[in-house]
Amino acid sequence: MPTPSMEDYIEKIYSLIETKGYARVSDIADELFVHPSSVTKMVQKLDKDEYLIYEKYRGLILTPKGTQMGKRLLERHALLESFLSIIGVDSSHIYHDVEGIEHHLSWNSIDRIGNVVQFFENHPDALEALKAMETTKPETNE
């Protein structure tokens, strides 16, 4: 299993390839706010663990294993954003909160959260009842 840091890189590489068609070391560094040398070290580790194929000065491509993992990680991120939005978390906090929790949940927990999201998507009346509960409680600034 990849470490949380490896997951961040795989997710970002997958996202870049999906949007731009490629992922360069400099693009990854810019997106993750790290030095290119840090990206190179991680890319070499991901190559060794068969998540991608990296050739110095030529770029990188995700292996089927890396593509599958990247897709799953991006879906996990989107699901958690949806969940936090549904339960009424302020949109200015959602990205940061997802980044803080996504690596600490089991895939079983992610699947259960997916069930909750799907339930509220299929039952708008229940979603309205949830939102009504939120408007009756005082807001905190934490």
Swiss-Prot record:
Domain (HTH dtxR-type) ranges: 1-63
Residues reported in the UniProt entry to bind Mn(2+) 1: 8, 99, 102-103
UniProt keyword list: Activator, Cytoplasm, DNA-binding, Manganese, Metal-binding, Repressor, Transcription, Transcription regulation
Regulation acting on activity, per entry: DNA binding is strongly activated by Mn(2+).
Subcellular location: Cytoplasm
Residues the record lists as binding Mn(2+) 2: 11, 77, 99, 102
One BP annotation, GO: intracellular manganese ion homeostasis
Subcellular location, principal: cytoplasm
SUPFAM superfamilies assigned: Iron-dependent repressor protein, dimerization domain, Winged helix' DNA-binding domain
Cellular component terms per the entry's GO annotation: cytoplasm
Family matches, as InterPro entries: DtxR_MntR_Metal-Reg, Fe_dep_repressor, Fe_dep_repressor_sf, HTH_DTXR, HTH_tscrpt_reg_MntR, Iron_dep_repressor, WH-like_DNA-bd_sf, WH_DNA-bd_sf
Residues in coiled coil: none
GO molecular function: DNA binding; DNA-binding transcription factor activity; manganese ion binding; protein dimerization activity
PROSITE patterns (UniProt xref): HTH_DTXR
Function: Central regulator of manganese homeostasis.
HAMAP family for this protein: HTH_MntR (MF_00732)
Subunit structure: Homodimer.
NCBIfam families according to UniProt: PRK03902.1
Family as reported in the entry's similarity comment: Belongs to the DtxR/MntR family.
The protein's name in its UniProt record: HTH-type transcriptional regulator MntR
Organism annotation: Listeria welshimeri serovar 6b (strain ATCC 35897 / DSM 20650 / CCUG 15529 / CIP 8149 / NCTC 11857 / SLCC 5334 / V8)
